[in-house]
Amino acid sequence: MKPASIASIKSQLTNGELTQKQIEELYKDSRKGVQAILKRHEKQQEKQALLKQAFIKMNTYEKEAYRNGNHYIAGVDEVGRGPLAGPVVAAAVILPKDFQLLGINDSKKLSEVQRNEFSHYIKQHAIAYQISFIDNTIIDKINIYEASKQAMKEAISGLQPYPDHALIDAVPLEGLNCTYEAIIKGDAESVHIAAASVLAKVARDDWMKELHEKYPLYGFNSNMGYGTKEHLQAIETYGVTPYHRYSFAPLHKYRHNTLLN
C-alpha cells in the first residue's frame, strides 16, 4: 500500500484525526518530511500542555469561590491609570464555570491580535460583562485612584446577574453587595480578572484610536495616551486637547491654558 502523503499526514495531525497508536507508527516512517512534521507536532503538544497547566493554575481562586457556594463570580480590572490623556476604563465579567480559553493572561502580555481575538471570544461566551469609562475631567477632580475605583464599581453594578463574589485586581472596593477578594497581580493569577483585563484594554485602545481620528498630531493610535517622547513633543508644539489630564505632573502648567479644540 502506498504510504500517505506528507501533506495528508500534516492535515490529519493538525485536525486531531490520528490515534496515539497511529502517531507512534509514523515514527517508523523514514521520510524526513514526516519526521519534521512529528517534531513540530511534539512542540505544539508540549506548548498546549503548558497552556493547560497555566489555565488550571489561573483557576485556583475561581475553584475556591465555587467551593464556598458562590454561583456567579465576576472578574474585575481596569486599564489606563498611567496615560496623560483619555479615560480610565474598567471591565467586569462573569464567565461560565466550564469556560476555557488557553493562553488567557494579563492583557499587557498579549499581542494586539490576541487581545482582539480573546475579547471577541470572551464576549461571545460570557454570562455577562460590563465596561465602564471614567473621563479625564472626573480623573482631574477626584484623582486617578478614586476614578479607577469608580470605574470598577460602575462595571460591577452594571452586571446582570449581579455577582455573588468578585475577584478584583489589587484594589479593595468597599460598598459592594457581594463578597470580594483583591488579588495582587490578579490579571496574571485569575482567569476572570485576566478576561476583564482584556475587555478593558481592547475597549480603551479602540476609544483612543477613535480619538486619534480627531487629533492625529498626538499619535493616540499608537501611544494610547501614554507619555511617550513623541506625545510630549506634540504637547509642547501644539498644546493640550480637551482629553488630556491636567492633574498629571507633566501637564500641570497647562491647567489654565487655552485648550486645542
Swiss-Prot record:
UniProtKB keywords: Cytoplasm, Endonuclease, Hydrolase, Manganese, Metal-binding, Nuclease
Entry EC number(s): 3.1.26.4
Leading EC class: hydrolase
Pfam family, one: RNase_HII
Any GO molecular function: manganese ion binding
S-S bridge residues: none
SUPFAM superfamilies, A to Z: Ribonuclease H-like (SSF53098)
An example Gene Ontology biological process: mismatch repair
Binding site for a divalent metal cation: 77-78, 169
Cofactor note: Manganese or magnesium. Binds 1 divalent metal ion per monomer in the absence of substrate. May bind a second metal ion after substrate binding.
Catalytic activity: Endonucleolytic cleavage to 5'-phosphomonoester
Cofactor list: Mn(2+); Mg(2+)
Family: Belongs to the RNase HII family.
UniProt-listed NCBIfam families: PRK00015.1-1 (NF000594), PRK00015.1-3 (NF000595)
HAMAP family: RNase_HII_B (MF_00052_B)
Protein name: Ribonuclease HII
Gene name linked to the record: rnhB
